[in-house]
Design a protein with these regions (language model features):
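Secreted/periplasmic carbohydrate-active enzymes, especially glycoside hydrolases
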Residues: 1-98, 102-103, 108, 112-113, ...
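Substrate-binding/catalytic cleft of secreted carbohydrate-active enzymes
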Residues: 81-84, 93-247
């Protein structure tokens, strides 16, 4: 069912601040307490806009790994600490990598104004198995539907580094299905079918560059935005472009 709420005052959910509304639903003796946030997130041209304002995504890659809990945080304080450490280092969010994170972690992201991209673990996926695609699509659907209302999630990225997909048709079909499924479940957020390397459908063409030499890294990418402007936004098919750049 649909409920329309009249708000006595309105404020937007903001990075680094949060800004949540408390929601209390009651029906007879039953009561449910929750929360929500109001914000917009989209790409426009070469810019990412949050609440209509250009925002540079300065993110860490967070795998949610803990020495004492492996892929489960030992305590809730550990979840909060990860966010606080990232903020303290000058970042404003994280790409949640190769894992569907705890809903409690996403709550603290919402509360603190920590931006994240949602992802799913695709490492070791056996595409030749007849149940592989069905299982993956079902579980990814559950993840998107569970986390749809978190204002901290500003985009979806179901796959990571799809090596060897260009030569295998069934893998390409899965990427296409994933993108279309994600946009059908949530048309409000941008989606990258696969971050890094090969892709089929995507609103963002991102790159992974692991060069640890700052000079060669700068030489490779310096002036990229100027080259794009000179060609009117047209670049060679094999050359990626950044999804955002600081102004």
């Amino acid at each position: 069912f649909t409920v329309q709420l009249d708000l006595s005052e309105t404020h937007l959910w903001e990075p680094g601040k949060g800004g949540l509304y408390t929601l209390l639903l009651s029906f007879g003796e039953d009561r449910v307490k929750s929360y929500f946030g109001l914000r917009t997130a989209k790409f426009q041209g070469r810019k990412f806009l949050l609440n209509g304002k250009s925002l540079f995504q300065r993110f860490v890659l967070d795998q949610g790994f803990y020495p004492d809990g492996i892929y489960t945080a030992p305590t809730e304080e550990d979840l909060v600490k990860d966010i606080q450490l990232s903020f303290a280092a000058g970042f404003n969010g994280a790409r949640l990598h190769e894992k569907v994170f705890e809903a409690r972690f996403l709550y603290h992201c919402d509360r603190l104004g920590y931006l994240v991209w949602g992802e799913y673990p695709n490492w070791g996926l056996d595409h030749a198995h007849p149940l592989s695609t069905e299982t993956y699509l079902n579980q990814w659907s559950e993840a998107v539907e569970r986390d749809f209302n978190h204002p901290a999630i500003i985009g979806w990225c179901p796959f990571n580094e799809t090596w060897g997909y260009r030569e295998e048709r069934e893998k390409n079909a899965l990427l296409t299905s994933l993108y279309k499924l994600t946009k059908r479940l949530d048309p409000t957020r941008p989606c990258i079918d696969s971050s890094g390397n090969y892709r089929i459908l995507s609103e963002v063409y991102d790159i992974h560059d692991y060069d640890q030499d700052t000079q060669s890294f700068q030489a490779r990418w310096d002036g990229l935005t100027d080259r794009i402007r000179e060609t009117g936004g047209v670049i060679p098919a094999e050359d990626p472009f950044f999804n955002s750049a600081p102004e």
